[in-house]
């Protein structure tokens, strides 16, 4: 409650950049609550958005103060037609493509079909930042970097490693 009332920040506020991956149906309606928590990035999952017709208007209407304080991204699942995000690219800071179908599951195998979606997106919008989350390990990460991915999001490949810091360094070297 103190965080929502802006009397204090998130734990480790100054040490960690928080990213909110909003796989919830009320993300747009509660956006002001999420912004009060001070994330560096907010990601809306397109498949969870109830009112897609007005979603672009919502993104365009985010004020410049909020835009300066955080990055706004839109995520799509591997089986979603990548062209569905084309109308949203101009009002987002990045697009996140999920690398797995079972979102939220650790250790899932990367869906190789995602590479074609990335190529299509980069051909149409070469300047857009692309992030991939799910199934990202050093092998898939290398392939993703080859097709133009800017950010890799990895959980189990890092946290299951015996040397977590060493694994992070390996990812940074990709």
Kindly give the residue locations of the regions a language model identified:
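Glycine-enriched alpha-helix->loop->beta-strand junction motifs that scaffold or abut catalytic
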Residues: 14-15, 35-42, 63-71, 90-100, ...
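Hydrophobic, well-structured mid-protein blocks that either form specific transmembrane helices
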Residues: 30-84
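Active-site beta-loop-alpha junctions enriched in small/polar residues
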Residues: 23-25, 47-49, 75-79, 98-101, ...
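Glycine/Thr-rich beta-alpha phosphate-binding loop at enzyme active sites
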Residues: 78, 84-125, 166-170
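Glycine-rich phosphate-binding active-site loops on the catalytic face of alpha/beta enzymes
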Residues: 42-51, 96-107, 147-168
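Alpha-helix-loop-beta-strand connector modules within alpha/beta enzyme cores
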Residues: 1-20, 58-78, 112-136, 170-174
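Structural motif corresponding to the early beta-alpha repeats
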Residues: 1-52
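Catalytic cores of alpha/beta
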Residues: 26-36, 79-92, 136-152, 166-168
């Amino acid at each position: 409650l103190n965080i929502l009332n802006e009397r204090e920040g998130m734990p480790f506020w100054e040490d960690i950049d928080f990213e909110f991956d909003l796989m919830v149906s009320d993300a747009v309606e509660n956006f002001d609550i999420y912004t009060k928590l001070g994330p560096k990035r907010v990601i809306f999952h397109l498949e969870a958005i109830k009112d897609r017709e007005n979603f672009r208007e919502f993104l365009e209407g985010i004020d410049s103060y909020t835009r300066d304080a955080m990055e706004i991204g839109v995520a799509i699942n591997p089986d979603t037609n990548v062209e569905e995000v084309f109308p949203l690219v101009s009002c987002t800071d990045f697009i996140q493509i999920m690398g797995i179908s079972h979102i939220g599951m650790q250790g899932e195998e990367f869906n190789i079909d995602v590479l074609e979606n990335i190529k299509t997106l980069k051909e149409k919008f070469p300047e857009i930042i692309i992030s991939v989350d799910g199934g990202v390990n050093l092998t898939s990460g290398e392939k993703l970097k080859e097709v133009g991915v800017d950010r890799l999001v990895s959980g189990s490949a890092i946290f299951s490693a015996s040397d977590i810091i060493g694994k992070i360094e390996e990812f940074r070297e990709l």
